[in-house]
UniProtKB/Swiss-Prot annotation:
Record's keyword annotation contains ATP-binding: yes
Major location category of this protein: cytoplasm
Subcellular location(s) per record: Cytoplasm
Functional pathway: Lipid metabolism; malonyl-CoA biosynthesis; malonyl-CoA from acetyl-CoA: step 1/1
Protein name according to UniProt: Acetyl-coenzyme A carboxylase carboxyl transferase subunit beta
EC primary class: transferase
PROSITE patterns (alphabetical): COA_CT_NTER (PS50980)
Organism expressing this protein natively: Brucella anthropi (strain ATCC 49188 / DSM 6882 / CCUG 24695 / JCM 21032 / LMG 3331 / NBRC 15819 / NCTC 12168 / Alc 37)
Gene Ontology BP term (one): malonyl-CoA biosynthetic process
Pfam families per the UniProt record, alphabetical: Carboxyl_trans (PF01039)
GO CC terms, sorted: acetate CoA-transferase complex
HAMAP family associated with the record: AcetylCoA_CT_beta
UniProt-recorded Gene Ontology molecular function terms: acetyl-CoA carboxylase activity; ATP binding; carboxyl- or carbamoyltransferase activity
Domain of life the protein comes from: Bacteria
Length: 301
């Protein structure tokens, strides 16, 4: 044995040997099949640079991209009874909750963040589709109400990012109760004279579209978002007719007056900051397009 065997060869083998590759190093564009480097995608707020496809993102990433300098504080999630119905399908609901909490690091599907956008203090309530499809249960409902109450307490506008498949079936009527409860919270914010902007992301469906997600002063949709009460497949099976192309897409809903604008995630922060400054009569509105001033004023009224 000599120094070549003991030192050089192992060094070469280590340099040329196979390295462990992180599973999420590359992300596939669902719209084109293109493979995109994860770091490039993250630096572009998880919008595919070539196609403009908006990937789903975690709630904490959403808050980081949205607030000034990525700085914000979160509200502690409210405590609610866990699995009061003792529900079980393929597995116990309480075990399913534990799995999602371990996987996501979240207590439930909603995160409330406090921070500023373009210097304006706001409350942001973000729904995370990665937690049981963003479904609305007692925990999520209580967190949404908490966000509205905090906005009223601090006299701040509230921006809500919706992403949900609807009510959480494992909680039955307790889940459905959150629809009127969150609706009341919206009305409390409006009675306080505070702006409420909703950003509809992909997907926003089910009971959330029958409550807080469609009660904003202004509704903004991300490009390509699916928005509706029932999914297109369910509707087609019910009416036994083929739906129009693009039905329930963000652009389709804007064309038919259901949302006010479709805005790229890359432009959301600046757009919302301009709108809120108009709605709260803050300085620095002179660069806002005239049609945005008119729409925002009409909505606020």
């Amino acid at each position: 044995m000599n120094w070549i065997t003991n030192y050089v060869r192992p060094k070469i083998n280590s340099m040329l040997g196979r390295r462990e590759m992180p599973e999420n190093l590359w992300i596939k564009d669902p719209s084109t099949g293109e493979m995109v480097f994860h770091k490039d995608l993250e630096s572009n707020q998880f919008v595919i640079p070539s196609s403009g496809h908006h990937m789903r993102i975690k709630a904490k990433d959403r808050l980081r991209f949205f607030f000034d300098n990525g700085e914000y504080t979160t509200l502690e999630a409210p405590k609610v009874p866990v699995d009061p119905l003792k529900f079980r399908d393929e597995k116990k609901y309480i075990d399913r909750l534990k799995d999602y909490r371990t996987r996501t690091g979240m207590d439930d599907a909603i995160v409330n963040g406090l921070g500023t956008i373009d210097g304006l203090p706001i409350v942001a309530t973000v729904q995370d589709f990665g937690f049981m499809g963003g479904s609305l249960g007692m925990g999520a409902g209580e967190a949404i109400i908490q966000g509205f109450e905090k906005a009223i307490e601090l006299k701040r506008p509230l921006v809500l990012f919706a992403a949900s498949g609807g009510a959480r079936m494992q909680e039955g009527i307790l889940s459905l109760m959150q629809l009127p409860r969150t609706t009341v919270a919206v009305e409390m914010l409006k009675e306080a004279g505070l702006p409420y902007i909703v950003v509809l992301t992909n997907p926003t469906t089910g009971g959330v579209t029958a409550s807080y997600a469609m009660l904003g002063d202004i509704h903004i949709a991300e490009p390509g978002a699916l928005i509706g009460f029932a999914g297109p497949r369910v509707i087609e099976q019910t009416i036994r007719e083929k739906l129009p192309e693009g039905f329930q897409s963000a652009d389709y809903l804007m064309e038919h007056g259901m949302v006010d604008m479709v805005v790229s995630r890359l432009e959301l922060k600046d757009t919302i900051a301009r709108l809120l400054k108009i709605m709260t009569r803050q300085p620095g509105n002179s660069d806002a397009p005239e049609h945005e001033k008119t729409e925002a004023t009409d909505k606020a009224a």
